[in-house]
């Protein structure tokens, strides 16, 4: 038995200079797992609660000492003596201890950090890599895939201080033979984009996720400069590289309208879906995330009707990694993919349940970071261990993003042909 003998919580810093929760789980025999909770900027209203202290005299109210005290107090007391390999049982103990729908008593940041640390400790106890342990927890032992990266090379919206409304413009190196080659392609495009922007006299400062954040006159202009960079880097857009958007539309949804203030345009629900469809006809955009507000379910039905057969429509704020909400989406034919952020739901077990449910319904699952990250690279192991096939973890810049890519390189080196890189076949509507 992988007996838990200690649980330790502490306050550490995330990539935006805000505190977050880190946890350690110690087992008999000297096995230790350590993990940190990420934090989002554009968040869905139904996400599990990230517990902050609210004490304006510390970290402008963003401290997490209460959540840390919950780790070191009630969570520790409840888990001492338990078996770390029994992940579902551990997570249920913490969920029951919290007793709320959205984990607002103990904090999803406290529960998640411990949940992931326990998984890492259990993997160490079993003498196997984390991705292999996750595959076993998922009921899919030995089934792996290297994910196609969605590389966020140009930022707008809540992730940048500029006049671009769409939050993320991403490249996907679908023509690569393996993950290592995909990473190289993305890096070359990233550096070429910097030259293109510099040549136009535009800013090459970066946003929260490492993408550039220049002032451009329209969202179409953002796509045009990316196209230029891809081609200048020696790649063919639509064959070697495809494009993906994260609209984060809830951020510019006001009074039932979609207000693209950067462009000076206002759309109704169907009009904004038509606008996005027109972009997919001009550029090889194969994936659109949060193309409408999380509450605009009628609009989502229309968007899925006009684009769902050819374009991957990803629900992030829409589904918030929640199986109850995903069930409603599946039953109503809303979207065809789910973004997986484990801090939206607050435990590894619930995260795996959402991935399994999505796959069973023919939806894809895209594993994702948050804009506030740490050096913790658990999502790399999660992507491979569930064979999710796609990952969003930012640009080729900032060590909090690159840490995940580097972990994926290590995993691919270990697994070789046991973890295929399937490129475009992983993306809904493109197989």
From Swiss-Prot:
PROSITE patterns: ENOLASE. Binds a second Mg(2+) ion via substrate during catalysis. Keywords: Cytoplasm, Glycolysis, Lyase, Magnesium, Metal-binding, Secreted. The active site is at residues 209, 341. It catalyses: (2R)-2-phosphoglycerate = phosphoenolpyruvate + H2O. It is found in: Cytoplasm; Secreted; Cell surface. Pathway: Carbohydrate degradation; glycolysis; pyruvate from D-glyceraldehyde 3-phosphate: step 4/5. One of its GO terms (cellular component) is cell surface. InterPro entries: Enolase (IPR000941), Enolase-like_C_sf (IPR036849), Enolase-like_N (IPR029017), Enolase_C (IPR020810), Enolase_CS (IPR020809), Enolase_N (IPR020811). It comes from the Bacteria. GO terms for molecular function: magnesium ion binding; phosphopyruvate hydratase activity. NCBIfam families: eno (TIGR01060). This is Enolase. The lineage of its organism: Bacteria, Pseudomonadati, Pseudomonadota, Gammaproteobacteria, Alteromonadales.
């Amino acid at each position: 038995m992988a007996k838990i003998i200690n649980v330790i919580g502490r306050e550490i810093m995330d990539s935006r200079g805000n505190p977050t929760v880190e946890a350690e789980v110690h087992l008999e025999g000297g096995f230790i797992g350590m993990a940190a909770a990420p934090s989002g900027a554009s968040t869905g209203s139904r996400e599990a609660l990230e517990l902050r202290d609210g004490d304006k005299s510390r970290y402008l109210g963003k401290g997490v000492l209460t959540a840390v005290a919950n780790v070191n107090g009630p969570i520790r007391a409840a888990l001492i003596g338990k078996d770390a390999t029994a992940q579902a049982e551990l997570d249920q103990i913490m969920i029951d201890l919290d007793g709320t729908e959205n984990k607002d008593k103990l904090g999803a940041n406290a529960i998640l950090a411990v949940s992931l640390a326990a998984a890492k400790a259990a993997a160490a106890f079993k003498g196997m890599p984390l991705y292999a342990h996750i595959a076993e927890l998922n009921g899919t032992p030995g089934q792996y895939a290297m994910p196609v990266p969605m590389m966020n090379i140009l930022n707008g919206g809540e992730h940048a201080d500029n006049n671009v409304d769409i939050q993320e413009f991403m490249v996907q190196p679908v023509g690569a033979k393996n993950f290592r080659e995909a990473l190289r392609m993305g890096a070359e495009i990233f550096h070429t984009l910097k030259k293109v922007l510099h040549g136009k006299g535009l800013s090459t400062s970066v946003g929260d996720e490492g993408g550039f954040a220049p002032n451009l006159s329209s969202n179409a202009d953002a796509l045009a400069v990316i196209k230029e960079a891809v081609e200048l880097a020696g790649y063919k857009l639509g064959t070697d590289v495809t494009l993906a958007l994260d609209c984060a539309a809830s951020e510019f949804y006001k009074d039932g309208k979609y207000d693209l203030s950067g462009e000076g345009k206002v759309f109704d629900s169907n009009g904004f879906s038509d606008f996005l469809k027109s972009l997919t006809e001009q550029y090889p955009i194969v994936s659109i995330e949060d193309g409408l507000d999380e509450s605009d379910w009628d609009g989502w039905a229309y968007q899925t009707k006009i684009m769902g057969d050819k374009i991957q429509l990803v629900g992030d704020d829409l589904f918030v990694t929640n199986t109850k909400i995903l069930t409603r989406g599946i039953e109503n034919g809303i979207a065809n993919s789910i973004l997986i952020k484990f801090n939206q739901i607050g435990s590894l077990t619930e995260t795996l349940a959402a991935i399994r449910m999505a796959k069973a319904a023919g939806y894809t699952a895209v594993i994702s970071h948050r804009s506030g990250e740490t050096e913790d690279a658990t999502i790399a192991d999660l992507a491979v261990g569930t064979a999710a096939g796609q990952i969003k973890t930012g640009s080729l810049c900032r060590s909090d993003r690159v840490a995940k890519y580097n972990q994926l390189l290590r995993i691919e080196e270990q697994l070789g042909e046991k973890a295929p890189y399937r490129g475009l076949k992983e993306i809904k509507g493109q197989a």
